[in-house]
Amino acid sequence: MTFSPPSKQRIAFLDQAAATYHKQLDGSPAAEYLRKRGLSQDSAQSFRLGYVASPLSGHERYAGLLAIPYINRQGTVAIRYRCISDHDCKEIDKHSKYAREPGDDAKIYNILTLTLPVPRIAICEGEIDTITAWQSGIPAIGVAGAQNWKPMFNRLIRGYTEVITLADGDTAGLKLADAIAEKNEHATTCQMPHDLDVNQYYREHGQAALLEKAGF
Ligand SMILES: [Zn+2]
């Protein structure tokens, strides 16, 4: 397979989409969702989170979803969309909690963290947990599920004195942590208490508790 960088047009389109949906965030159901999850307006701004109120052409299927741009030095390289309804997404036929565009492969979320001069970083499962850790003062990257941690990503986390995977408090939560620990001697796992993810832990116990638990 030959390497082809994302085209300039594609990045320009995604930048425009991210900016458009970010403008539609204020006062939207997505803003309310973020507020309930304890994510600050500052975070919504830095991560350019958005709401798809009026979708751009081709994005009709994402209407009503939270828009989560994946941003690197070139710009927006992907946007993932998350259902923000109160229902249990698994209970609904042919519906999933997350949507991504065709051809959008596994990527690291908040990859710009890797440009920071810090000795230790955290790895989270999911974008919301990554933002939660970040706004708490933890330099964090994330992937959307254990199956999205690709072997080539191990190269990106060499050179740190320690990488700490902040794992969900269930068996599935350890999958990502174990996949990372298996290939990285400097990786450790910090698992949240039973049935809590990083965001829930933060909401129940607060920022100071999360920092202490994660060791940052
Ligand atoms: Zn749903």
Which residues fall in each region the model found?
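Short, aromatic/basic amphipathic alpha-helical patches
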Residues: 175-184
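Phosphate-handling DNA/RNA-contact segment within nucleic-acid enzymes
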Residues: 10, 53-161, 176-177
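TOPRIM metal-binding catalytic domain and adjacent DNA-binding surface shared by DnaG-type primases
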Residues: 1-66, 115-116, 184, 216
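Hydrophobic anchor at the start of a short beta-strand
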Residues: 140-141, 163, 186-189
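A residue-level signal for conserved active-site and pocket-lining positions in enzyme catalytic cores
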Residues: 34, 74, 165, 198
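Acidic beta-strand-to-loop metal/phosphate-binding motif
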Residues: 123, 160-172, 191
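Short, acidic/turn-prone active-site loops that include or flank metal/cofactor-
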Residues: 144-149, 168-171, 192-195
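Metal-dependent DNA phosphodiester-chemistry modules and their immediately adjacent helices/loops
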Residues: 204-216
